């Protein structure tokens, strides 16, 4: 099945995650290397390769292009080839989760979402709350009861309402899914939003 990009979706009719496809041939024609060189560095430099169509819908907290760092001592110690890590800790919320959630929130803004919810026990909730709060989208987070206090505090400080659930992350996910119709939130659970 085909699903239009400018419509709200969670899973496919078959209950499977949706994957976004881009017209790379069209992007190649529309975007030149010279145009890229003239743009400021950062995630949105690559906007033609991202799902947000209008610049006015971009939600940003200053995402940077995160560097690749070579670890030659570790490579020697392990006796293998080159080891390179990507330093995603430089993203605004200090986690790679910011990279995906900036897209989810920007698309949510573009599609008129006013309330987002997710199950999490940490970084994803903080990233969702930071981006959503920055553009006026209400955020509700469900965490297992044993989620470390520092994680819950970070999510709350970013502007979300947090509920602790006596159960596992799957139980939190069920609450988000079941509460969608009643609470009117968009389910931003992992693999339940395509961006």
Locations of regions flagged by a protein language model:
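PLP-dependent amino-acid enzyme catalytic core
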Residues: 1-195
